[in-house]
Amino acid sequence: MNAIPTYKYITHLNPRYSSSDEHLTPLIRNQTPYLYAKANSFIDTKGVEMRPFNLSLLAKTCQQDTNLVVQMMRVNNMLLSNNNLRNCSVPFHTTTGRTTNIGPSLSSFKKNLWSEVLNPAPGYQYVLLDYMNQEPIISACLASAHEIQAIYRQADLYESMRKHRDLAGLNRGRIKGMLLPYLYGQRSDSYAKEHGIPLAEAQRYWLALAEIFHLVDQELNRRSQLAFKNGFVSCLDWAARVTPLSAPLSVRNWPVQATGADILRRAVIGLVDAGIDLRLTIHDSFLLRVPIAEQEQQIAKAITVLKQASALVLDGFELNVKVDGVFDGQVGVV
């Protein structure tokens, strides 16, 4: 599946992916990709205030994960002359139009390590905001699965799914860990083998998920068939060529990932326009630098922007947003 590049604010089919007699016309006309690329470049130049990883943590990590400790040491070397680590990201780097962070970055590490290195200036702290259950709910919105949308508005989706008779014995984390592979198209036998559970048990879970997400399955399958028929798939800001050799599961999941990227771009533009100090984006999360004296107002303002961004893409439906971490520079405190 080939990405169709974006230039400024018009996304075209690219002639080098096309037959000589194919009529090429613009698929998408809007300024969002251009505005996002500009905002993203501005965010990257600001960077994130960090301190080096301490030696005891490096030694402990070295015993567990040598690849991770190499990343940590690379970051330490970059912080020798400057306590501000700039991010290097590439907009529209994937076929779904998502941005990819390249090279040493805070995004290279799991969140449990962030408190070891984040070091905001006095009077400031970093706040991580995150869209809740983004991919399942995007799928539900694409499929007009109103029952799932209603559950999401009122309660935690994964907790609510435990009410199903065949999922009642599972905790929230287990259900979350099953749902995403299911939505991505993983088969029950593959899941059973990967997690070392009986095939009959995995099949029972998959049947339960199919009962809950049958409208989603139908819609994603329909979009996938249409993409193979038309030879391309598109969202608000991006498009990709689909060929008979394209991976079916990737094509099926493309609208969900691409819609998430559409939302992120509008959220970034909205945060920058609102004067919120956004320092880093990671998939569907946003790291903000906020004055402690204005913490509540800034967070509330940012959450409003993120909800509005999702509504612009999901026909008025707002994704829930949570505070997923607060980092004030104290080591080990999230």
Where are these regions (language model features)?
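Extended, well-ordered alpha-helical scaffold/bundle regions in very large, multi-domain proteins
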Residues: 2-64, 185-213
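Short alpha-helix boundary/capping elements
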Residues: 146, 183-187, 290
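Acidic, glycine-rich two-metal-ion catalytic cores of nucleic acid-processing enzymes
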Residues: 23-169, 232-285, 299-308
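Short, solvent-exposed polar/charged micro-motifs at secondary-structure junctions
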Residues: 136-138, 289-291, 329-334
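Conserved catalytic core of nucleic-acid polymerases
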Residues: 162-281, 320-334
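Hydrophobic alpha-helical membrane-insertion segments
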Residues: 139-141, 194, 293
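C-terminal, non-catalytic extensions of nucleic-acid polymerases
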Residues: 95-96, 299-334
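Catalytic palm subdomain of template-directed nucleic-acid polymerases
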Residues: 190-191, 287-303
